[in-house]
């Protein structure tokens, strides 16, 4: 794979990049050699990294082109970059050159391998205990322990309140200034512009809160007030800051200073958008309860647990914060709370210590893992006979029992394989294939979930009896659609597996003639 820089859209950013590389490259004289990448890419396996070098993911825009095997490779990267497992190199000023033959030469689809990493049974992301931690989980210690995707983005003073101190930007090297200018001109969003020497606290690890632990766009409703009116958190914070003698300020001063305990949650629609409606208890009876409406990806810092969210995959995409799942009874802490500031490294980031992902890679990992977890949970909770008695029936959606989340990853994977292998049309050998569904089975497959919801107290066998009675009462015209579909499936199965109808007799007495 060869990467070339597109210069027609962002010439200024490209020129600046080449200028910086020209100043730092030694022994380069020819104009063609200016395009040679002499830096040690931080995300390349086996390379030591230097903070002064330009990072490859900060280039203006890269486009994949077909390479000519007869030409020399420029900006040539091995196919396993950004997901190769390797020990993290330490940041040092002395970098060593690694021979080019250390790169793997076989072409591997990196996106496919990334999906395999994220959804494999051995993946740490697939462990169910990942979301059921009993020990305290703390998320961020210093930026040295963070990957670029997890570092907070530069905060614009025009959009949100407090920005980073001005002294912080004075400490940046000229190379960092050049990078920042190139990013702003080329429209690139860089999440790694913080210095590696800065200690990140609670406030710098996610977007600024407007009031307590709530972000911009949240709506509040205090139960203690005589008029339970909804108000935007921005308006509430503005009214409280304008006049300390304000009634709201006097009533809600110090509200939930020790955290807000989550009592209930539900999803609702507000102004045409899906939101979470959460009810919190401040811990004091005189303050009363609080109900809020917030976005689905809203992150919360939970006491003795760390960053949590109702939709961790959405939160990591929107805010770059890996989260656990939040549950009823969790205590959400405000910024500045001692339990939210003094913390160690996070077990969440232990998952990524052996992989160096880009922001897009990391988001894909969490999304794929979340999808795979949900699928395996649905495959494993249908009961021992459900998936085998009616192989083609869809999996129950209301099977999330409390004990199902405690199953180990290996047991989930085993059950998923068993359920998947019991499909109607086998893709392996003809000896293991099963007969396709007949007309009644197709009918039962279509209406089983509906009848299960109509009769919640009935088990699977009783539902089958009800479906059979309904099938007997149907007219031939109504059955015709299922009969034609069953014949089509049978013909296709015969074409793919001609020996599917040849039953193998056993020595059991029940099958003796």
From Swiss-Prot:
Species assigned in the record: Rattus norvegicus
Protein name: HMG box-containing protein 1
Compositional bias ranges of the Basic and acidic residues kind: 165-181
InterPro entries: Ataxin_AXH_dom, Ataxin_AXH_dom_sf, HBP1, HMG_box_dom, HMG_box_dom_sf
Keyword Transcription: yes
Biological function: Transcriptional repressor that binds to the promoter region of target genes. Plays a role in the regulation of the cell cycle and of the Wnt pathway. Binds preferentially to the sequence 5'-TTCATTCATTCA-3'. Binding to the histone H1.0 promoter is enhanced by interaction with RB1. Disrupts the interaction between DNA and TCF4.
Positions of region (Disordered): 151-181
SMART domains per the UniProt record, alphabetical: AXH, HMG
Description of what induces expression: Up-regulated by insulin in differentiated cultured adipocytes.
All residue ranges annotated as the AXH domain in the record: 202-343
């Amino acid at each position: 794979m060869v990467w070339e820089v597109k210069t027609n859209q962002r010439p200024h950013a490209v020129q600046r990049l080449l200028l910086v590389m020209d100043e730092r490259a030694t022994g380069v004289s020819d104009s063609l050699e200016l395009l040679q990448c002499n830096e040690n890419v931080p995300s390349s396996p086996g390379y030591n990294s230097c903070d002064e070098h330009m990072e490859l993911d900060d280039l203006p825009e890269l486009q994949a082109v077909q390479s000519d095997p007869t030409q020399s490779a420029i900006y040539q990267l091995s196919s396993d970059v950004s997901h190769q497992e390797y020990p993290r190199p330490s940041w040092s000023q002395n970098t060593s050159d690694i021979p080019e033959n250390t790169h793997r030469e076989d072409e591997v689809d990196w996106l496919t391998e990334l999906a395999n990493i994220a959804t494999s049974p051995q993946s740490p992301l697939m462990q169910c205990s990942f979301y059921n931690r009993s020990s305290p989980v703390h998320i961020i210690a210093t930026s040295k322990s963070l990957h670029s995707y997890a570092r907070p983005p530069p905060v614009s003073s025009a959009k949100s309140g407090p920005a980073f101190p001005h002294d912080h930007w004075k400490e940046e090297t000229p190379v960092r200034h050049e990078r920042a200018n190139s990013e702003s001109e080329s429209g690139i969003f860089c999440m790694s512009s913080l210095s590696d020497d800065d200690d990140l606290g609670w406030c710098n690890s996610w977007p600024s809160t407007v009031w307590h632990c709530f972000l911009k766009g949240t709506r509040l409703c205090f139960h203690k007030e005589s008029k339970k009116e909804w108000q935007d958190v921005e308006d509430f914070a503005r009214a409280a800051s304008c006049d300390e003698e304000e009634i709201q300020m006097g009533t809600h001063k110090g509200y939930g200073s020790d955290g807000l305990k989550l009592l209930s949650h539900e999803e609702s629609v507000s102004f045409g958008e899906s939101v979470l409606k959460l009810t919190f208890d401040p811990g004091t009876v005189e303050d009363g309860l609080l109900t809020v409406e917030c976005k689905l990806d809203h992150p919360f810092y939970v006491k003795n647990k760390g960053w949590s969210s109702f939709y961790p995959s959405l939160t990591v995409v929107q805010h770059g914060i890996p989260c656990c799942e939040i549950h009823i009874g969790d205590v959400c802490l405000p910024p500045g709370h001692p339990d939210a500031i003094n913390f160690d490294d996070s077990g969440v980031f232990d998952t990524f210590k052996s992989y160096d992902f880009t922001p897009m890679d990391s988001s894909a990992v969490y999304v794929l893992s979340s999808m795979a977890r949900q699928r395996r949970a649905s495959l494993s909770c249908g009961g021992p006979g459900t998936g085998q008695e009616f192989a083609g029936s869809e999996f129950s959606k209301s099977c999330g029992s409390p004990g199902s989340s405690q199953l180990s990853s290996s047991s989930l994977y085993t059950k998923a394989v068993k359920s998947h292998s019991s499909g109607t049309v086998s893709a392996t050998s003809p000896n293991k294939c099963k007969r396709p569904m007949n007309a009644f089975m197709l009918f039962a497959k279509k209406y089983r979930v509906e009848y299960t919801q109509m009769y919640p107290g009935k088990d699977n066998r009783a539902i089958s009896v009800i479906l059979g009675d309904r099938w007997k009462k149907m007219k031939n015209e109504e059955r015709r659609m299922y009969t034609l579909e069953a014949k089509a499936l049978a013909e296709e199965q015969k074409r793919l597996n001609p020996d599917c109808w040849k039953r193998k007799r056993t020595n059991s007495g029940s099958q003796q003639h």
